[in-house]
Amino acid sequence: VHWTAEEKALVNVVWSKTDHQAVVANALGRLFVVYPWTKTYFTKFNGKAGDSAVQTHAGKVVSALTLAYNHIDDVKPHFKHYEGFHVDPENFRLLANCLNVELGHTLHKEFTPELHAAWNKFSNVVVDALSKGYH
């Protein structure tokens, strides 16, 4: 994936202006409401963003996003350790959609079409890297 300097700067805007844990936890809460079948893998979760199990999982998602952010030019090799997990890769896409909604809600007017496009590209790279390990 080729990143322009502008795209990287826009991804940095998202990364620097958000509370990662809160955004991801809220996105997970939204995921479980909008796509209830995704709770199949999280039977002990009550599905609310403030739930300790959701917060713990949000921390894992934040760690993966941080890893991708820190290696934005070459994400896939850094996601090898996710191979062998048995999760439907489509759930990653659904979570990415929920993250976009939550970021729009969090950043309001700052979530411009350009910023949205750059973040969407980033999340697609992450989803693709994660999905490779689950096939």
From Swiss-Prot:
It holds the Pfam family Globin. One of its GO terms (biological process) is hydrogen peroxide catabolic process. The keyword Glycoprotein does not apply. The keyword Signal does not apply. Red blood cells (at protein level). InterPro entries: Globin, Globin-like_sf, Globin/Proto, Hemoglobin_oxygen_transport. Residues 2-135 form the Globin domain. One of its GO terms (cellular component) is hemoglobin complex. Heme b binds at H57, H81. Keywords: Heme, Iron, Metal-binding, Oxygen transport, Transport. Hb 2 is a heterotetramer of two alpha and two beta-2 chains. This fish has three hemoglobins: Hb 1, Hb 2 and Hb 3. They all have a similar Bohr effect. Involved in oxygen transport from gills to the various peripheral tissues. Belongs to the globin family. This is Hemoglobin subunit beta-2. It comes from Somniosus microcephalus (Greenland sleeper shark).
